[in-house]
């Protein structure tokens, strides 16, 4: 037994095996959650429209996700004439891989992260910023004006709302004094940041809707204008990778909102019935509740026009988040609450 322990923890191969198992422990449940998020979304939208939704494949339609996956696997990947084949295939892979590796620093419990690094918040911000490249490459490589227009919209939209997201993160970091996501959650042991910083939480979540190209900010793939945007020429598994990446990014925005504002794995109150529930269960429940809000918004809020989207990002969210950041810094300084940076 000690020999196995020495092999796993004292050799490079053993550490590689442990890291791979940790990654699988995150990715396999994430893929299942993404698959069933599509079914749950269709159920929610059906309920909003007074319909039943998927109810044929399996009991209550619960196997619909596997039917959709089988359909995608059996379809043919068609590459348009004039498209750059290498970049055309690279774009969905890049989008999917970036959506997956972002989860490396997300702690679902105290210390439960594949990579518990001290710059976790900065890492997530960097990965979310890189996501736009997959969309731009897809739009350019498809050799389609609809795809290219969608890619241009995506670039402008993501850059616009990343600024507000950055200011929100800086405000949180002023309160915590650390870029480590584990420290951010533990700093909310007594009061979740959503209470003193409610406007910033709202800005962060709405900016997350725009960052993931979800309704009401889905002008990147506006069906009534540019068909499916940057994905218009994609089919089969290449399209499925974009789809999986989009839903994984939605889960990431919900996870970031949970970690930054809703106390991560911490219960609402540190009392006996609530702290019996394991931390990962609280984390998953909060993420699923925020995912429901994503679906609810899609079923109830109409799509913004492009000019309305830009105006909201640059003329409302940006100045408000900057003012709130300065206000937070002033309050922390005057009250003597600025944390000591290690």
Curated annotation (Swiss-Prot):
Reaction(s) this enzyme catalyzes, per UniProt: a quinone + NADH + 5 H(+)(in) = a quinol + NAD(+) + 4 H(+)(out)
Main subcellular localisation: membrane
Transmembrane annotation, as ranges: 15-35, 86-106, 119-139, 159-179, 190-210, 251-271, 277-297, 316-336
E.C. number(s) listed in UniProt: 7.1.1.-
HAMAP family linked to this entry: NDH1_NuoH
Family recorded in the similarity comment: Belongs to the complex I subunit 1 family.
Protein name as catalogued: NADH-quinone oxidoreductase subunit H
Species for this entry: Granulibacter bethesdensis (strain ATCC BAA-1260 / CGDNIH1)
Gene name for this UniProt entry: nuoH
């Amino acid at each position: 037994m000690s020999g196995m322990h020495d092999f796993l923890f004292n050799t490079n191969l053993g550490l590689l095996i442990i890291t791979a198992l940790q990654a699988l422990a995150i990715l396999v449940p994430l893929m299942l959650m993404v698959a069933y998020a599509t079914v749950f979304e269709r159920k929610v939208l059906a309920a909003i429209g007074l319909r039943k939704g998927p109810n044929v494949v399996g009991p209550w339609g619960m196997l619909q996700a596997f039917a959709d996956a089988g359909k995608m696997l059996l379809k043919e990947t068609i590459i348009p004439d004039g498209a750059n084949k290498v970049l055309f295939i690279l774009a969905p892979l890049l989008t999917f891989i970036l959506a997956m590796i972002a989860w490396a620093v997300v702690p679902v419990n105290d210390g439960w992260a594949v990579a518990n690094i001290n710059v976790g918040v900065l890492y997530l911000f960097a990965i979310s910023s890189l996501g736009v490249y997959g969309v731009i490459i897809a739009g350019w490589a498809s050799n389609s004006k609809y795809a290219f227009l969608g890619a241009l919209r995506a670039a402008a939209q993501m850059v616009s709302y990343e600024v507000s997201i950055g200011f929100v993160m800086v405000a949180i970091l002023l309160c915590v004094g650390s870029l480590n996501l584990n420290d951010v959650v533990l700093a909310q042991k007594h009061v979740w940041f959503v209470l003193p910083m409610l406007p910033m939480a709202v800005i962060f979540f709405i900016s997350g809707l725009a960052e993931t190209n979800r309704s009401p900010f889905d002008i990147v793939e506006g069906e009534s204008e540019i068909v499916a945007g940057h994905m218009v020429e994609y089919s089969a598994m290449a399209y499925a990778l974009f789809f999986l990446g989009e839903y994984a990014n939605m889960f990431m925005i919900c996870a970031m909102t949970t970690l930054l504002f809703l106390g991560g794995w911490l219960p609402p109150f540190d009392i006996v019935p609530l702290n019996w529930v394991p931390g990962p269960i609280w984390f998953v429940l909060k993420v699923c509740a925020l995912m429901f809000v994503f679906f609810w918004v899609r079923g109830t809020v109409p799509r913004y026009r492009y000019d309305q989207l830009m105006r909201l990002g640059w003329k409302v969210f940006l100045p408000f988040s900057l003012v709130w950041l300065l206000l937070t810094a002033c309050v922390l300084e005057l009250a003597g609450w600025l944390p000591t940076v290690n």
